[in-house]
A protein has these predicted regions:
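Hydrophobic transmembrane helix segments
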Residues: 15-39
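Membrane-water interface at the C-terminal end of transmembrane alpha helices
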Residues: 2-15, 110-125
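Internal alpha-helical transmembrane segments of multi-pass membrane proteins
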Residues: 3, 58, 62-80
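Canonical alpha-helical transmembrane segments
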Residues: 47-63
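Alpha-helical transmembrane segments of multi-pass integral membrane proteins
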Residues: 9-10, 44-49, 104
Length: 125
């Protein structure tokens, strides 16, 4: 039950903060409207990522002795992997992809990971 609570807390924090980052990026950096990651997918993708984070923590709690320590490493690896498609948007010259837009997307991933890791490792231990 504590994993569910920790995941819910992470959801309640991460989704609005990522939407705020998106809004800020659109205004401050003039991220083009054709930038696909900002076309209505921020909230559902953030929610999906947080739910997957909670599921991963639940699995680790069942299979390893120190789930929190292992989870931090797994989450860090997942975060680094999540940046690969972000950078790829620039490499493949995706329509609307700009350095500030991609950096904002990477910041969202980082913020979500930090919130999920903190919530899961402190509340769901």
């Amino acid at each position: 039950m504590r994993i569910v609570v920790a995941t819910a807390i992470a959801l309640v924090l991460a989704v609005p903060l990522n939407l705020a980052i998106e809004a800020f990026a659109r205004q401050a950096f003039a991220v083009p409207p054709e930038f696909e990651p900002f076309q209505g997918t921020v909230a559902p993708y953030t929610a999906g990522g947080v739910v997957l984070a909670g599921a991963a923590f639940a699995v680790l709690r069942r299979v390893v002795r120190d789930a929190a320590r292992v989870y931090v490493r797994v989450a860090l690896g997942a975060l680094v992997l999540s940046w690969i498609p972000d950078v790829a948007l620039l490499v493949i010259h995706d329509p609307g992809a700009t350095v500030p837009g991609v950096a904002s997307l990477m910041a969202m991933h980082t913020l979500t990971a930090a919130i999920a890791v903190t919530s899961l490792t402190r509340i769901a231990r």
